[in-house]
Amino acid sequence: WSRFYAYTEESYLALMDEFQRRQLPFTVGIIDMDWHLVDVDPKYGSGWTGYTWNREYFPDPPRFLKNLHDRGMHTALNIHPAEGVKAHEEMYVEMAKAMGVDYEKGDPVNCDLADPKYIQEYFCRLHHPREEEGVDFWWIDWQQGGSTKVEGLDPLWILNHYHFLDNGRTGKRPMTFSRYAGPGSHRYPVGFSGDTLITWESLDFQPYFTANA
């Protein structure tokens, strides 16, 4: 289940209870971007990129994710990585230190997907801690262009590549969820069908549409 809606822990779990009551089977819970802080000071960007839980909505993330696991569901979080890491994020200082950014000035850690060092810290400091809390995989919702500082290197392609490899680092079968990145991009992720209507007719059409994207 995934919906672009500002769920809380309580409202999301109540919805899962209602699905169970109606005998509607769901095996994956994907939380859209409101899991993280979005209403941030404009000096920190748009709020679309984020890695810090919104504790007003999810006061105990490990408890919430465990509750979904206890229901037999896998879990994923939505991310828009383009704006990097800004000074309001809880892991900003350690990320800035690792990347040689002046954290005392609050300089942003820019997203540079062509930099192997950034890729390393991106996973180590932004994603692995969330996975330790119970996140199983990620929804890569890149919408910010198709170029990097390396000619021909598409940012969504490289994100799909590295997220797939990183998700399998413990020996499990890798899993990642992503937008369409051009011909052949089904090599790595399960494809995101795009925004849809919540109707049975739409659900019936989506497997055909996604398989032919």
Question: Each PLM stretch: what is its role?
Answer:
Residues 1-213:
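Catalytic-domain carbohydrate-binding cleft regions of carbohydrate-active enzymes
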